[in-house]
Amino acid sequence: LIINSFSEENTRSLKKELEVFGTRVVAISGDITQSKVILETVDAGIQTFGKIDILVNNVGGGSVSEVVEKENPLAEVEAVWDGTYAMSLKAPVLMCEAVLPHFIERQSGKILNISSMAGRPGMPHVDLVPLSSSYHSAKAGLIRYTQLLADQMGRHNINVNAICPGIIYTDGWKEISEEMVKHHPNYKGEDPREWFLGVSAGRYSEGGVPQTPMRREQTTNDIAEAVVFLASDSSANITGQTLNVDGGMVKD
């Protein structure tokens, strides 16, 4: 297994966790929006293991800019969109393009792009954070790229699918939630986790767990199970699809 994370600490920690199970792990730390880092990651996998069978693009996020230029009112907008697209769309696209020659040569491969419910039609747009519009757009772009790539790669026995996680209280969302209940006038004093899940007083009618058919949040294990299925031989004839793992929030 080869893993990459921007945080060297996170990479080391995950490597240790995986090695407990006897997994052979190559860990690389670096900015995955940079093509040099992407090529190093792919090359390390091929050199170490002789081949790559599966690519999971579990990368995303956005950029909240602190740029302030009175002479250029679009500077902040530009910085936010550039940062968000680099992380949530450009990085997974470049990673796919880097591994495709190897997959085509072997006439085999699985690609799984982790998108977001934010990129799905019917997902409500709640303008709560500065990166919202750019993030929704980038994740929608990743879904469309997945579909187009599946059309192109099917003849090479390469499956390309996407997964859209639902309501999961990740470290990133924890940080955003804490900022919202600290500074937003409508949510001050609320519990960050309850705010994120949509069960706090200020957010109950805005969307969240109470508005989903299953009435429960999702977990990282839910997403892992979906990844395992789409990476297995059981999904040999599934390609170009986007699997929502969201408790029924979006039905498209």
Q: In which residue ranges do the predicted regions lie?
A:
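Short, small/polar-rich loop/turn modules that mediate ligand/substrate recognition or access, typified
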Residues: G154, N159, I238-G240
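A short, exposed helix-loop element centered on a Lys and neighboring polar residues
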Residues: C96-E97, Q147
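Catalytic loop of short-chain dehydrogenase/reductase
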Residues: L112-R155, G166-Y169
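Alpha-helical segment proximal to the catalytic Tyr-Lys
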Residues: P101, D151-Q152, A236
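Substrate-binding pocket helix/loop in short-chain dehydrogenase/reductase
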Residues: E66-Y85, L131, G208
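Short C-terminal tail/terminal secondary-structure segment
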Residues: P121, P210, M214-R216, A226-F229, ...
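Conserved glycine-rich Rossmann-like NAD(P)H-binding loop of the short-chain dehydrogenase/reductase
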Residues: L1-S13
